[in-house]
Design a protein with these regions (language model features):
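Short amphipathic alpha-helix that is part of the acyltransferase structural core
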Residues: 1-43, 50-56
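Conserved GNAT acetyl-CoA-binding A-motif
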Residues: 94, 101-114
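Conserved beta-strand in the GNAT
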Residues: 50, 56-65, 72-79
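A conserved beta-turn-beta hairpin within the catalytic core of GNAT-like acetyltransferases
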Residues: 65-76, 85, 131-135
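Conserved active-site tyrosine of GNAT-family acetyltransferases
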Residues: 21, 121, 126
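Conserved acetyl-CoA-binding loop-helix of GNAT-fold acetyltransferases
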Residues: 80, 86-99
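C-terminal "cap" of GNAT-fold acetyltransferases
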Residues: 107, 114-116, 124-143
Length: 143
């Protein structure tokens, strides 16, 4: 199993990136308001990332540099296709994301986790710092 982290920076990469996010984060949750043209995707300091397993796109995440001087990165819009969930793909994605973030000077990652994803992040060493009922804020030092 070879999981690769790719920047979503070509036409095929963007198509796969948006298809995975639309399906996992919107369609499966009964939402229809996905916007693939949202300007945050192209802001300086935002890194839309695509993960492929043996050449097949299986997951996405975006790393936003919240405060580059303080070394803080925000993990956003994490999505793994359902058929690849609970197979170690999400954990491997987070490991590769941490390595990538470290190359950008990130020392701490934050994420507003879906309530049902909190145990996943806790297993990976994240800690809740704001237990909001909708999306708890979690953090993990990486540097």
């Amino acid at each position: 199993m070879e999981l690769r982290l790719l920047k979503a920076d070509d036409v095929d990469g963007w198509k796969a990136y948006h298809a995975i996010r639309r399906h996992v984060l919107f369609e499966l949750r009964g939402q229809e308001n996905y916007d693939p043209t949202h300007p945050d995707e192209h802001r300086e300091g935002h890194f839309p990332l695509l993960f492929s397993l043996d050449g097949t796109p299986v997951g996405t995440v975006r790393l936003d540099m919240a405060d580059a001087q303080a070394g803080v990165g925000i993990v956003r819009l994490v999505a793994v296709l359902p058929e690849y969930q609970r197979r170690g793909v999400g954990s491997a994605m987070m490991q590769r994301l941490q390595s990538f973030a470290a190359t950008k000077g990130v020392q701490r990652l934050d994420v507003h986790a879906a309530r049902n994803a909190v145990p996943f992040y806790e297993k990976l060493g994240w800690h809740v710092i704001d237990p909001s009922p909708d999306s708890p804020l979690m953090t993990k030092p990486i540097g």
